[in-house]
Amino acid sequence: MTIQSNEFNVAIVGAGVAGLALAMALHRKGVLFTIYEEAKEYSVVGAGIGFGPNGMQALDLIEPGFRPLYEGLCVGNKSADAQWVFFEGYLLEPGLGDNKPWAGNLKSAWGNQDYVRKSAHRKELLDIMTSFIPIESVKFNKKLVSIKEYTDRVMLEFADGEIVAHSILAGSDGIASTVREYLLRPTHPEEALPVYSGAHCYRAVIPMDEAYEIMGEKTDVAKIYFGHNRGAVSYRITGGKELNFLLIKATPNEQWPYPGRVTKQITQEEMLADFDGDNIDDRFRRLVAKAKPVKWGLFHHAKTSTYYKDRVCILGDSAHASMPFQAAGAAQGVEDALVLAYILEELMKSPTRGSEQLEEINAGLAAYDAIRRPRAQKQLDRAFEVGTMIYFQHPECGDDMTKILHKLQNGWLDWLWFPDLKADVETALSQMRNDVQKKA
């Protein structure tokens, strides 16, 4: 690819939720882009996925046509009186805590009356998102192997030998991001790779009739089950026809034993052994027996010192891969895409091109970083903290469910769910314009 001197063109590496959201936004704004995806097609790995109110607010601003399509297929809690519930807390121990004074009648639930739970299957979500993106702007089987920056362009080389030039590279290539490593290894090598959080999980999607046979009415409302160094998460997807679940084991003092990979095929016996013991309700052993014997390490990007350098930036899991316990990773990636798209639109509209635009680009990406990085980092930190609550490792709460629920039920998610994203965009654009004026 050769970029004309007057052409502003964005490379998006990675076709996950954040990359697709950015592509949707850029397409609507008329900003030229190409998505480069390593896989041969869009990935459906991940099964259940959802957006909080902040994610839906961001998508409304990116593409108003998204919401009606998404709401036509997503599903929430079954009970009409539980639509506001994010999760309801119970125990992993025999009896599930049904006899505890804090349990029953949604007493152990947390959420918000202005929140409505919505979850979908990842494939259904991607089908909607990709319907807003021209297929000719997407290239599959593109494994990025090299990045080279010049004052007037960034060059990408792929494993098939193709070399392309773009004005900006936006890396949304997931937790094991090539773009992140390029960005951070020279100055912050300890941040280049994801960090093991001290826990692993097993995951599955099963038909609701099978789930109901095991868990009964506990399948009606999204649940988190708390336990000593173990936990479980479950919620309905696919219009209520299936249950998505994770079963988690915490190993806080151990290192991940499989360097260079985040998953490991193991035996059925090894998987079942993680949920042995008299302190675990037998229903969870029946559930884990339905999972594939694949151990998923729970990794995250514990700290990230910058989301950009010159013409290269990161978003989504490449920037802030997180624990899943606030179901917030996808929405944070969409927020990234929203702010970044407005910055890139501003750069496209500028008459400056080539080397002369580098200062402008730095001002724009610095503004993106200033708005998005602190908020995404806070979400990441809080999601990790919820994990410590689930495994009864929280330094303040321990295994005291009354203390845990007090934390979760008193506005724990309000700051995350109800931001003013229009104000975030305006603040980013204002900072960018001010920086450009100062340097003029």
Curated annotation (Swiss-Prot):
EC number: 1.-.-.-
GO cellular component: membrane
Cofactor (UniProt): FAD
Disruption phenotype annotation: Does not affect BOA degradation.
Binding residue positions for FAD: E37, G50, R122, D317, A330
Membrane topology: Single-pass membrane protein
Cell compartments where the protein resides: Membrane
Induction cue: Expression is induced in response to 2-benzoxasolinone (BOA) exposure.
TM segment ranges: 7-26
InterPro entries: FAD-bd, FAD/NAD-bd_sf, FAD_monoxygenase
GO molecular function terms attached to this record: FAD binding; monooxygenase activity
Pfam families the record matches: FAD_binding_3
Active site: R203, Y235
Similarity comment text for this entry: Belongs to the paxM FAD-dependent monooxygenase family.
Function of the molecule: FAD-dependent monooxygenase; part of the Fusarium detoxification of benzoxazolinone cluster 1 (FDB1) involved in the degradation of benzoxazolinones produced by the host plant. Maize, wheat, and rye produce the 2 benzoxazinone phytoanticipins 2,4-dihy-droxy-7-methoxy-1,4-benzoxazin-3-one (DIMBOA) and 2,4-dihydroxy-1,4-benzoxazin-3-one (DIBOA) that, due to their inherent instability once released, spontaneously degrade to the more stable corresponding benzoxazolinones, 6-methoxy-2-benzoxazolinone (MBOA) and 2-benzoxazolinone (BOA), respectively.
The name this protein goes by in its record: FAD-dependent monooxygenase FVEG_08293
Provenance organism: Gibberella moniliformis (strain M3125 / FGSC 7600)
Lineage, highest ranks first: Eukaryota, Fungi, Dikarya, Ascomycota, Pezizomycotina
